Regions:
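Short alpha-helical segments that sit at the start of domains
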Residues: 1-25
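Minor-groove-contacting beta-hairpin "wing" of winged helix-turn-helix DNA-binding domains
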Residues: 71-77
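Short amphipathic alpha-helical interaction segments
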Residues: 43-61
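Short, amphipathic alpha-helical interaction segments positioned at domain boundaries
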Residues: 78-92
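Short acidic, hydrophobic short linear motifs in intrinsically disordered regions
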Residues: 21-46
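A short, conserved structural fragment
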Residues: 60-69
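Short amphipathic alpha-helical segments
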Residues: 8, 28-29, 53
Length: 92
């Protein structure tokens, strides 16, 4: 699976939320709100081409995120590694 900028936005939102909220997991509604506010000035916002639900499902199926006991989303080890790898590449 090739991850694009919107997938990385989702991974970053999940990781940031967990860090800022004492390891609390992010709920789907909170993830949606944060995602759309983060990309509100992006062209994809107006066309809804970001397709949030499909992206979350694909990230879940590919093992980047998990929904722990239906209480909220968190990154898997694979998701954390991918996000940190992307941050290193962007920093170069």
């Amino acid at each position: 699976m090739f991850l694009d900028k919107y997938d990385y936005v989702i991974l970053d939102i999940i990781q940031t939320y967990k860090k800022n909220n004492k390891n609390e997991l992010i709920k789907l509604s909170q993830l949606e709100t944060a995602f759309w506010s983060r990309i509100e000035h992006d062209d994809a916002q107006s066309t809804r081409s970001a397709q949030l639900g499909e992206r979350i499902a694909n990230l879940y199926l590919e093992g980047y995120i998990m929904n722990k006991s239906n209480t909220g989303y968190r990154l898997t080890k694979k998701g954390k590694e991918e996000l940190s790898f992307q941050e290193v590449e962007v920093g170069l």
